[in-house]
C-alpha cells in the first residue's frame, strides 16, 4: 500500500485539514496524525506519486509553513515535533559475538606470581620482628649513658640538708686547737706545782 509522508504540519491540524489538503488526489484509506507530521495511505500508488509531486512545498490553510510531502519509507516511529522528514529504517543486524577461548596462562607466569606473593608474605611477617627489635633497642639505655649519669651524680653538689649535717658533725678547726692549747697549759701548770712542792723543804726538817 503506497504511503505519503506530510511534514511540518501545524500542531493544531486535524484529519479533516489533511483530507482537504489532499482532496482530488484519489481515495485515502487511512490517515495517522502525529505531533507535527502525518502519514497518509492511498489506495493507488499513482495518486500518491501525483500528490507528492504537486503538493511538496505548499502551505496548508491557516498556516504559513511550507509542508514537506514525499513518499514514506516504512512505518512511522515516534513523534517529529520539528516536522522533519520520515525517519528511515535502520537495519539492525544482530551482532555476532565471537567467543574466543580463554587464554591459557603459561606456567612460567604462574610461578613468577607465586614467588612474588611468597616474598611479599615473608617480608610482611619479618617486618614486625624488626620493628619490635628497634623499639627494644631504643627503649634499653646504653652503658655509655649509665656511666655519664653516674659521673654527673658523683660530681653534683650535695643538697642543703646534707651540707648542714656535715657542718654540724665536724668540729671547727680553731676550737679544737684552742682546747688542745688549754689542756697543754693546764698540764704544764700542774707539773710546775708538783715540782715546786717537791723542792721546798718541809718545816720539820733540820737546816744545814
Curated annotation (Swiss-Prot):
Region of interest (Disordered), residue spans: 71-208
Top-level taxon of the source organism: Eukaryota
An example Gene Ontology CC term for this record: nuclear speck
Basic residues bias locations: 84-123
Main localization, broad class: nucleus
Keywords from the UniProt entry: Differentiation, mRNA processing, mRNA splicing, Nucleus, Phosphoprotein, RNA-binding, Sexual differentiation
Domain RRM: 2-74
Post-translational modification comment from the UniProt entry: Extensively phosphorylated on serine residues in the RS domain.
UniProt subcellular location: Nucleus
Gene Ontology terms for molecular function: mRNA binding; RNA binding
Record bears the keyword Transferase: no
SMART domains recorded: RRM (SM00360)
UniProt biased composition (Basic and acidic residues): 128-153
Note: RNA-mediated interference (RNAi) of rsp-5/rsp-6 resulted in fertile animals that exhibit excessive sperm and delayed oocyte production, and sterile animals that develop morphological abnormalities of somatic gonads.
Family note: Belongs to the splicing factor SR family.
Functional description taken from the UniProt entry: Plays a functionally redundant role in shifting germ cell sexual differentiation in hermaphrodites.
Protein name as annotated: Probable splicing factor, arginine/serine-rich 5
Taxonomic lineage: Eukaryota, Metazoa, Ecdysozoa, Nematoda, Chromadorea
Amino acid at each position: 500500500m503506497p504511503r505519503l509522508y506530510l511534514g511540518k504540519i501545524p500542531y493544531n491540524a486535524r484529519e479533516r485539514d489533511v483530507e482537504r489538503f489532499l482532496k482530488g488526489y484519489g481515495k485515502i484509506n487511512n490517515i495517522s496524525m502525529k505531533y507535527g507530521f502525518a502519514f497518509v495511505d492511498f489506495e493507488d500508488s499513482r495518486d500518491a506519486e501525483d500528490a507528492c509531486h504537486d503538493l511538496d512545498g505548499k502551505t496548508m490553510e491557516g498556516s504559513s509553513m511550507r509542508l514537506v510531502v514525499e513518499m514514506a519509507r516504512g512505518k512511522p516511529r515516534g513523534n517529529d515535533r520539528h516536522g522533519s522528514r520520515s525517519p528511515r529504517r535502520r537495519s539492525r543486524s544482530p551482532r555476532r559475538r565471537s567467543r574466543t577461548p580463554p587464554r591459557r596462562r603459561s606456567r612460567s607466569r604462574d610461578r613468577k606470581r607465586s614467588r612474588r606473593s611468597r616474598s611479599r608474605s615473608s617480608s610482611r611477617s619479618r617486618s614486625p620482628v624488626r620493628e619490635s627489635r628497634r623499639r627494644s633497642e631504643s627503649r634499653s639505655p646504653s652503658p655509655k649513658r649509665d656511666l655519664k649519669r653516674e659521673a654527673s651524680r658523683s660530681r653534683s653538689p650535695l643538697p642543703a640538708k646534707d651540707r648542714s649535717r656535715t657542718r654540724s658533725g665536724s668540729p671547727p678547726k680553731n676550737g679544737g686547737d684552742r682546747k688542745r692549747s688549754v689542756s697543754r697549759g693546764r698540764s704544764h701548770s700542774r707539773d710546775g706545782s708538783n715540782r715546786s712542792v717537791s723542792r721546798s723543804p718541809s718545816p720539820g726538817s733540820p737546816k744545814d
